């Protein structure tokens, strides 16, 4: 029997439609209608503000532009006429009006973004309510599709109910919950393009919109007042500069990222725990969620120094101190609140002996607190204990401030010591603080009392500790090899490090790792680069000694290629006290980042050699009840995509995961895979739930680490319910993937088919991107890549090498950003159509097989879904306008050839995706998403034409000799203006298009 016969039997057996799937379809339709309804209010507000802020003539042109862009579905001559009218309207604008138009459309898209976030939040709350009702009213459906094939996000309640109905044993679920380790790592790049000041105004607008559009009953005057407040807030927003005037410092980026912890996540995480506990009690009442955190956070902001010279050891030190300060401030506030609440008197309640004994020790340690508070709290032991706790937190904050001000290189003597010189007044570790809180909790429980506020604080302590988020150090591999090479030259070895073969390097590094004598001499004047490399390790040692290893234990090596890349870092860590060979311990987790396709293919052989080393295995940390050595590996989506295209990159990562997991299991090593996913599809982005379910079965085992890029933080974590939705989505996906085996992953013929598709896709992609000699010029001229580099949104340079213009030096983020702005979105789909077509040419019947893969294999469905979504955002009419307007005359013929290649591939990919999905239009299976994308596609058109007009004039100016910066205010956009004003206009259009497309790079 063939696979297709099996598929037909499976389809025939589905007598009953899946209720969850039906409910999701209904919810999607409702979300679409809700968007249309609420959009009327937003558009009315937008038009009201624009009319009040712009001259009448400008308003009429602006509204006409929007009207023209809203005309969907027209083709042929009428479409050409529409585009011509848009171009003519833009030509009538002077620069001031063009800037106003760009700002107006940008404002519109950001209002729509706020609206959609609120609808997502409402839909999440509705799904929780709907899921509870369906659970009560729904009988077991034996014909429901396999759980591993469900890609609509599930709530905890829905997931646990389905697991119970699938007879997943309680013991298996309980073991997974104990082992579960989800880590979300915030990064600064690609940076959020919206200013922090503007974000604040957006939150205010979102709050007012929520009130105005809620079901709450308001009087007519109250509604009018809300409406006036909204108009006023949007007008204030309109008069606020959207552009960053200065390049942000690294500490600015730190402050921005930590904002989400302060405003949302600190309070959301205890709610997440309560939700999982509540849902678990309904389906698996005998299972308790472990107190240990199953989801924690990391950060690269302030510690990722790969290609960013602004991230120095001092910056990382100050970042750690700042994070600690925020946590201590929150804990002090919470302890004060608890002290107000726990007014329990010993006259009416017993207190544990352990608590009373601790009060006596505190009296000796803090006599001044005893003198101040003992009389007031004589019969209120909990308040007295919390007063001592608060005092220790204050001393901890004082110590943290001293360390921050002194810097990492200055040793600060212990000043906060009690009468006992071996006893610190401040908390030396989070465990000491947690023990004090648990002492209070245990005493309350012993007397049949509970305190939700205390439980909330304990949950926060387990998740955030004093560090808030663990800092990952990241550095490029050549920085370590160059530093060690300089060292070997100084030591005058027979061969310098760079001159050694890979085998010689490994032997020498292993020997030095086991040698107790120091290798790096002190008081040597190293080069600036080498000195900074060594200083990072010295700073890390100091940081861990002061704050504990949790603050900064992971060291990510970007562009990892070989075994020596990892051993170099271990050797440097050993030299500065982070690794102790004699005790077989390491305070540093060395994480290779495999980024290119070639490195992904070689990753298993690299790790095989390391796992065969007893020394290496002994230095890995231990996890779980079996105390297995843990190896973390990072997989790079961005550079592998830029290197070989979307389909090839995703398949190589998929294959690498399977090979690495099999290898780790054979050596008794636990594996945690770190996914370096970006915000855009071209850098591994897309729906998290779908992406996690698409991971190969058996590779997660409850452990996953994922980057959360700067550009998506606002869309995921700006509102409490949005944050909870994202966190619940990730958690349920990890549980689902880990517990329910997806049988389709192990189908050999499917893997062979995917390998063929990946090879063909890679060949076609590389033929254009790497082998076509005109592609670099096309990208430089036809996209706003040079202007993007002038946006003051990131502390990191756009290129790895200053002055280089080749693609290899260009980072993946601006690579994707440029293609997105010009509406090609090429990195996210190019090569897929050709691969599919060549497969079907070899066997036309494989179209049925591809349809089956799309229905039954989460990985393949994820690929097709991402390509479909990306194709829906491509606009070749706009892209063609970029090419014809911005491309130089001498390159016209070559550029036309490139555009024809892209256009043909787009049409081919679109046709075959629709054949595979069986849908008449892109996104027709998701009405809400289709409506949102269609709305943005139409309304964004004028911004693209505005951008082209401004770029044409700006680039003409740049080709002229320097001239006066005086702005001529009369005339159309084609007249003479200063470079700075033209650049400002162009940057505003970049902001607006980024808001409309909802991502940068």
From Swiss-Prot:
PROSITE patterns: PEPCASE_1, PEPCASE_2. InterPro entries: PEP_COase, PEP_COase_bac/pln-type, PEP_COase_Lys_AS, PEPCASE_His_AS, Pyrv/PenolPyrv_kinase-like_dom. Its EC number is 4.1.1.31. The active site is at residues 189, 642. It catalyses: oxaloacetate + phosphate = phosphoenolpyruvate + hydrogencarbonate. Keywords: Carbon dioxide fixation, Lyase, Magnesium. Pfam families: PEPcase. One of its GO terms (biological process) is carbon fixation. GO terms for molecular function: magnesium ion binding; phosphoenolpyruvate carboxylase activity. Gene3D superfamilies: Phosphoenolpyruvate/pyruvate domain. Its cofactor is Mg(2+). It is an enzyme of class 4 (lyase). GO terms for cellular component: cytosol. Forms oxaloacetate, a four-carbon dicarboxylic acid source for the tricarboxylic acid cycle. Belongs to the PEPCase type 1 family. PANTHER family: PHOSPHOENOLPYRUVATE CARBOXYLASE. NCBIfam families: PRK00009.1. This is Phosphoenolpyruvate carboxylase. The lineage of its organism: Bacteria, Bacillati, Cyanobacteriota, Cyanophyceae, Synechococcales.
